[in-house]
Amino acid sequence: MATVLTTAIDVCFNPQNSDTKKHSLFLKPSLFRQSRSRKLNISCSSLKQPKTLEEEPITTKTPSLSEQLKPLSATTLRQEQTQILSKPKSVWVNPTRPKRSVLSLQRQKRSAYSYNPQIKDLRAFALKLNSSIFTEKSEFLSLLDEIPHPPNRDNALLVLNSLREWQKTHTFFNWVKSKSLFPMETIFYNVTMKSLRFGRQFQLIEEMALEMVKDGVELDNITYSTIITCAKRCNLYNKAIEWFERMYKTGLMPDEVTYSAILDVYSKSGKVEEVLSLYERAVATGWKPDAIAFSVLGKMFGEAGDYDGIRYVLQEMKSMDVKPNVVVYNTLLEAMGRAGKPGLARSLFNEMLEAGLTPNEKTLTALVKIYGKARWARDALQLWEEMKAKKWPMDFILYNTLLNMCADIGLEEEAERLFNDMKESVQCRPDNFSYTAMLNIYGSGGKAEKAMELFEEMLKAGVQVNVMGCTCLVQCLGKAKRIDDVVYVFDLSIKRGVKPDDRLCGCLLSVMALCESSEDAEKVMACLERANKKLVTFVNLIVDEKTEYETVKEEFKLVINATQVEARRPFCNCLIDICRGNNRHERAHELLYLGTLFGLYPGLHNKTIKEWSLDVRSLSVGAAETALEEWMRTLANIIKRQEELPELFLAQTGTGTHRFSQGLANSFALHLQQLSAPFRQSDRPGIFVATKEDLVSWLESKFPPLVTSQA
């Protein structure tokens, strides 16, 4: 006979104050206000006979709570455990701030197409629609009536998916909808929207989406992804973000395709913090980003030049065991270039080769740009030889990038070999950018004869002359004092449709400053007048001795404001050179002062406790000589006022990154020699040094009143 055991247990619950908030998620607050002491009755039944008092040992020890509950656990707890099929992933979630998932880990499944027996006829009809050219919409609509089979759901969907031009797709969609033969499902809208996306027709896509909302048609992940990516292609980032937020409001979770697209949108909008927040929240919910998502992150950090961010992307990919593809490597290489890390870019490229991937044209172009920017000529040429040996793909952009790198560094022989390779190539014949790069190389090396021969060859080949090529050739001929050829090239370029820009005008100004006769100067002035009449008026103004300073100041302001920012300093340099060539030295000093006043020469003067320096690296020869003279005047006045001077004075001309860029340093050294200035060539090239004692002594000899002021 079963025996019933009944016992009473006192249970006391004392919650900690710090845990109140945590327990309030599960218990009502009223439970904590009730009595904390409860009596619970527990009944247990057993088939065994109860022991008598004589059999029960006498003990004074009070049984613990676990001992009292042991009979209950023996009858209510199951001995066998539920088998777990797979090991669950452990994800830590902060209990005080729980976050819901931000995306669905399952991609939107595409609708399966059922077999259509009329597929052959319908595809032939779609091919006819694609090949036909229509000037009027009515012509296309009349042709739709010739559809070989009734436009039911499957037939209409097959034709809609086979059309290529977005105008025809949109018209066919509206035609089917007007028939009202069947309800328009989401897939019809998605197919039409994708076609409109190719045509960058965001307004039509948005109208269709709003129409879906109005008619109660469901918008799925494919719909939202198409809307967002189309807005991104049209640079309508605010619209993309608006539809992404609207997606969340409807309760639909984006899949990884939509999520990667919105990451790219936030990235292009410059919202780095939002991108990282979305990325980290998605990873915390179990998302494993693919190569596309990492490419977005790498591009974002690369455009900002954030090397630490690029390292973060590489570490994340490694920790998640995501192998980058060629697109990701291209993005990261471009990012390394913007961050100024050529060594790391080379290591990344070698890692790509070791992974068994073959670089494409974009990969090689990005690497050549990095090497060219860093002046790594040897590495760039080795890469070129490796390209030819392994027969890697090369296109126009890659060839021209290599040529431009040779032009920047001054590698004439290598550029000629590369240019000849392009001539022998079937697919990559030289274009106007290729010829421009070669003209730049010959111009920088002073090879006027070769430059003219190349120009004539360019005309015979029927290659269009561009303004940059004209500028390079005019500069080369001007340095060679071949003024008649300058006029010939300029006239021919204008006839060929070249529109002069500020760079070409600045080049004509520099040629005018080099003219040794008034006749040559007038020829160049005639060319400049066809390009910029206001500039010619200002040149006549500054060489006139009767022009007052205030007039020069006002006209200078108008000319500079009408000039592109990158051409303003070259303009001022050339104008100073023209004044010095016409023995208008005081006017040259006025123009230098105005240029400094309007911010054209930042960093011209630098001062520390130990040394003062004059940086003329961005100045022309005449402007550098004028700046030196002005600096000496200022130092003479400082000595006159008996102010403190440093122990060392420096003048920096630089050596230039180009092999032929030694003109400024040589001309500046010659000018110092003519002045008998105490500056001497330093061990570092392009730097001239003078001590305080030598400079003060020289200034006192040049300005005798200083001797009495120092006595």
Swiss-Prot record:
A molecular function GO annotation: rRNA primary transcript binding
Pfam families linked: PPR_2, PPR_3
Domain Smr residues, every copy: 614-696
Keyword Transit peptide (UniProt): yes
Sorted UniProt keywords: Chloroplast, Plastid, Repeat, Transit peptide
Each PPR repeat, start to end: 185-219, 220-254, 255-289, 290-324, 325-359, 360-394, 395-425, 431-465, 466-500, 501-535
The organism's place on the tree of life at top rank: Eukaryota
Gene Ontology CC, one term: chloroplast
Protein name: Pentatricopeptide repeat-containing protein At5g46580, chloroplastic
